[in-house]
């Protein structure tokens, strides 16, 4: 809710979330903190978290113990590290960026303020695109808890003209 207070002075035209309940709950908390009572919202599966395939639902620390640190870091932070029956970050990029370009970017270019609530990996994929991050550097791209990224777009620009980071201290929950 404290993070939402950083948005009090912003008028949003629309919100986008993934189709997963966690982002709906986060959006509700942000809107409450910003004292926004209604906002048109679009739920899009293209913004969903990475599919971890056979690892979905597993405790990440148990997985790390089972597969070792190198494979664990490859899965969590690698660009094209395979997961059995799941997605790589490259796969997430391949669905998030086209959705952004066709659905969200035109609104930004029309001067709308868009609130996007997504997951760590879908945001990391979008950051790769917006911030021109090379594949080799993706392991170091983080979206920490308690931060909002604010990208500014001009009507003729396909990429942001400015990026700000807003943050509050939030105690991370061990997930």
List where the protein language model places each region:
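Active-site-proximal alpha-helix that buttresses catalytic centers in soluble enzyme cores
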Residues: 1-38, 66, 84-96, 139, ...
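Short catalytic/ligand-binding loop motif for oxyanion handling, primarily in non-cytosolic enzymes
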Residues: 23-26, 50-53, 82-83, 123-126
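Short, well-ordered beta-to-alpha junction loops that form the rim of enzyme active sites
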Residues: 17-20, 46, 77, 112-113, ...
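Conserved histidine-centered catalytic loops in small-molecule metabolism enzymes
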Residues: 10-46, 71-73, 130-131, 152-175
């Amino acid at each position: 809710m404290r993070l939402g207070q950083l948005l009090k002075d912003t008028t949003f035209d629309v919100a986008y979330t993934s189709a997963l309940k966690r982002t709906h709950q986060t959006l509700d908390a942000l809107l409450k903190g910003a004292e926004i009572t209604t906002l048109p919202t679009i739920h899009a599966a293209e913004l969903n978290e990475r599919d971890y395939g056979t690892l979905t639902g597993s405790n990440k620390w148990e997985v790390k113990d089972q597969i070792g640190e190198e494979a664990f870091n490859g899965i969590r932070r690698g660009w094209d590290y395979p997961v059995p029956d799941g997605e790589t970050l490259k796969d997430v990029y391949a669905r998030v960026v086209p959705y952004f370009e066709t659905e969200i970017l035109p609104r930004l270019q029309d001067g709308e303020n868009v609130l996007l609530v997504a997951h760590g990996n879908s945001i990391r994929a979008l950051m790769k695109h917006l911030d021109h991050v090379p594949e080799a550097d993706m392991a170091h791209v983080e979206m920490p808890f308690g931060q909002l990224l604010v990208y500014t777009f001009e009507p003729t620009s396909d990429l942001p003209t400015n990026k700000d980071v807003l943050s509050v201290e939030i105690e991370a929950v061990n997930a």
